[in-house]
From Swiss-Prot:
GO terms for biological process: translation. This is Small ribosomal subunit protein uS11. Belongs to the universal ribosomal protein uS11 family. It comes from Helicobacter pylori (strain G27). Part of the 30S ribosomal subunit. Interacts with proteins S7 and S18. Binds to IF-3. The gene is rpsK.
Length: 131
């Protein structure tokens, strides 16, 4: 009988980080939340689709709120107490995600920045939808 190769899983190392940056990427289809330290190293992340929301439900404000709460609960385990917020994209979960970061107990918001890239008349946009 052949021996099984068992691979050991990586253990999550608990970091002690006081300040972090919350990146909210709100697209028309999904909302991604990434929490990093001040140097840009990723601590944890969460998405609306990863929480079980499928199809058009991923782009709802409620799904964005749940994604923020999930990511911040993971970040609190690493000791994050103060965060800055960087928001990108035109999605519907954008405002709700910002509000739910501010409403989370034990996390203080230091600043909010909009980092949505705006073209100076770059690429031609796609044609209009006809329904």
């Amino acid at each position: 009988m052949a021996k099984r190769n068992v691979t050991a899983k990586k253990k999550v190392v608990k970091k002690n980080i006081a300040r972090g940056v919350v990146y909210i990427s709100a697209t028309f289809n999904n909302t991604n939340i990434t929490i990093t330290d001040e140097m840009g190293n990723v601590i944890c992340w969460s998405t609306a689709g990863g929480l079980g929301f499928k199809g058009s439900k991923k782009s709802t404000p409620y799904a964005a709120q749940q994604a923020v709460e999930s990511a911040l609960s993971k970040a609190k385990e690493h000791g994050v107490k103060e965060v800055g917020i960087k928001v990108q994209g035109p999605g519907s979960g954008r405002e709700t995600a910002i509000k739910s970061v501010g409403a989370t107990e034990g996390v203080k918001v230091l600043w909010i920045k909009d980092i949505t890239p705006l073209p100076h008349n770059g690429c031609r946009p796609p044609k209009r939808r006809r329904v």
